[in-house]
Amino acid sequence: MVWYSSCRILFLGLLILLASSWVLDRCEGFGEFGFEFHHRFSDQVVGVLPGDGLPNRDSSKYYRVMAHRDRLIRGRRLANEDQSLVTFSDGNETVRVDALGFLHYANVTVGTPSDWFMVALDTGSDLFWLPCDCTNCVRELKAPGGSSLDLNIYSPNASSTSTKVPCNSTLCTRGDRCASPESDCPYQIRYLSNGTSSTGVLVEDVLHLVSNDKSSKAIPARVTFGCGQVQTGVFHDGAAPNGLFGLGLEDISVPSVLAKEGIAANSFSMCFGNDGAGRISFGDKGSVDQRETPLNIRQPHPTYNITVTKISVGGNTGDLEFDAVFDSGTSFTYLTDAAYTLISESFNSLALDKRYQTTDSELPFEYCYALSPNKDSFQYPAVNLTMKGGSSYPVYHPLVVIPMKDTDVYCLAIMKIEDISIIGQNFMTGYRVVFDREKLILGWKESDCYTGETSARTLPSNRSSSSARPPASSFDPEATNIPSQRPNTSTTSAAYSLSISLSLFFFSILAIL
């Protein structure tokens, strides 16, 4: 199945030195609408917004930053086939900005007249909120060199299609705090990072979409979101400075609202390309040939939780049942002790290269291996998960290759966690993952996120046919875009230090008060 059979990305050029945009072409595809999302440190972002001190994408510093950011996740609480195609209108471009603290974000267009907002994407929270009628909001993003990008602030009074959500609405969870049923519904979301919160009232307005066909018919999708009047904590320092787009399972989330209004099926997909770019598509229910596993919906705070029943590494297979959350906002994969030990020790026993001795301060991963200077490629044992129901989930990108001072190393990009396992972005790379909230299944199918069903492996990969060794994958370091020179290890600037501190923050919702 072709995900977007005739899509292409149009580069619009620099609007100013800080930002660039990608517009979605009209294209044939599924019964869905979608937009691209991008990795903050991906090549496209670095090419457009070269920041002072930005870590090389394959450097040890890059992976330390991403792993540190992921660790903060641990506090988080944890329609029909013939539907007309719908997509964001021209102007709902995806923007990737160096200074933005979240790793994945996109532009959305809201209101009448419409304004664009650069929102962080988060499957771990539910509420979509925008900075709104606030006096202390972040109003611009600055780039090294002094250029800046002005950010819009939402105002209900400035949009003719905006209405306040009353306290008697089914989406108002704190009606007991209202003076009357007709009062504006208040919200406050507290996060687990240094007094960070968003407070305001719920509003309803138009999220601008168009039919994804030749007619390009405008579809004004009315969604409920937070008018964030007061933001505290790291929101003032640049993390999600222009709003947050919740993708969770609660009724208040945008996917839930779109499904209830009959605009899109109660399902969406996220595709992770090998270059750090990707797509998110609402209404995408996947294909008949995708592999699937049931979602474990657990109250009071449901997440995209699945059950793994078996792990295979090379020729070593272990029956081990454990739950894991599929979380698009986590860069690496975190496993509880039994699963971590099974994978890492099996991998280590089959690895052909010498173990690279490292420290926590140098690399966040425990199992790393040195590459011989004269080797153009190397083999590693294939990793495969079996999900509840029997479907196989081959992990196409379990490794990262990192140039160190003395040699290149490759690491098994998993880490140990004490509470619940998290399937992170690296284990989702090469797949279009479908979060079907109607059927309560998680589906997956190989995809390059652009041209459809091409192989998820852009790196040369062969299964070993030798009976002397277990199955293995072949990996060509030259195909990973590793710079030919070692990264500069000089001290980074103060501006870069601030950028890193923001990237480490991960929103963890405690409660809607």
UniProtKB/Swiss-Prot annotation:
Phosphoprotein found in the keyword field: no
Catalytic residues, chain numbering: D122, D327
Annotated signal sequence range: 1-21
Residues where lipid is bound covalently (GPI-anchor amidated serine): S484
GO biological process: proteolysis
GO cellular component: plasma membrane; side of membrane
Biased composition, class Low complexity, residue ranges: 455-474
The keyword Cell membrane appears for this protein: yes
Domain (Peptidase A1) ranges: 104-445
Keywords, in A-Z order: Aspartyl protease, Cell membrane, Glycoprotein, GPI-anchor, Hydrolase, Lipoprotein, Membrane, Protease, Signal
Principal cellular location given in the protein's record: membrane
Molecular functions (GO terms): aspartic-type endopeptidase activity
Membrane topology: Lipid-anchor; GPI-anchor
EC number of this enzyme: 3.4.23.-
Ranges where the record places region Disordered: 452-488
Location(s) in or outside the cell: Cell membrane
Propeptide: 485-513
Protein role: Aspartyl protease. Not able to cleave BAG6.
Family: Belongs to the peptidase A1 family.
Name of the protein: Aspartyl protease family protein 1
Organism: Arabidopsis thaliana (Mouse-ear cress)
